[in-house]
Swiss-Prot record:
InterPro entries: Ribosomal_bL17, Ribosomal_bL17_CS, Ribosomal_bL17_sf. GO terms for cellular component: cytosolic large ribosomal subunit. GO terms for biological process: translation. This is Large ribosomal subunit protein bL17. The gene is rplQ. Transmembrane segments: none annotated. Part of the 50S ribosomal subunit. Contacts protein L32. Pfam families: Ribosomal_L17.
Length: 120
C-alpha cells in the first residue's frame, strides 16, 4: 500500500489522520497542507463508504477510527452519528469521489502549499 510518511512516526501519522478525519466529518471543510489533504482523502472516502454500508460491523470499524467528539451541541450528536446519519445518506447514489481538494496559495510562515479539502 502506497502512502506518504508526512515526516512523522507511524503512531503520530495515524493520530494526525484520525484527528483530521474527525474534523472533516464534523466541519465538512478544513484547510491543511496539500500532502495532508491528499492523504486524508483516501481515509475519509473509506469512512464514508463504511457509513454507506451501515451495518453493525461497519459502524464498529468506523468507531474504532473516528474520535469521540461532539459534532452538534444542540442535538448532542457525535461525529460517528453524523457520519452514519447525515453524511452517508447524502452520498447514497454516489460511487466514490466524496471529497474535493482546492489548492490555495503558500502558507505565510514556511511557504508550504496549502489546500482546502471539503465534502462535495
Amino acid at each position: 500500500m502506497a502512502y506518504r510518511k508526512l515526516g512523522r512516526t507511524s503512531a503520530q501519522r495515524k493520530a494526525m489522520l484520525r484527528d483530521l478525519t474527525t474534523d472533516l466529518i464534523i466541519n465538512e471543510r478544513i484547510e491543511t497542507t496539500e500532502t495532508r489533504a491528499k492523504e486524508l482523502r483516501s481515509v475519509v472516502e473509506k469512512m464514508i463508504t463504511l457509513g454507506k454500508r451501515g451495518d453493525l460491523h461497519a459502524r464498529r470499524q468506523a468507531a474504532a477510527y473516528i474520535r469521540n467528539e461532539v459534532a452538534n451541541a444542540e442535538t448532542n450528536q457525535d461525529a460517528l452519528q453524523k457520519l452514519f446519519a447525515d453524511v452517508a445518506t447524502r452520498y447514497e447514489d454516489r460511487q466514490g469521489g466524496y471529497t474535493r481538494i482546492m489548492k490555495l496559495g503558500p502558507r505565510r510562515g514556511d511557504g508550504a502549499p496549502m489546500a482546502v479539502i471539503e465534502l462535495v
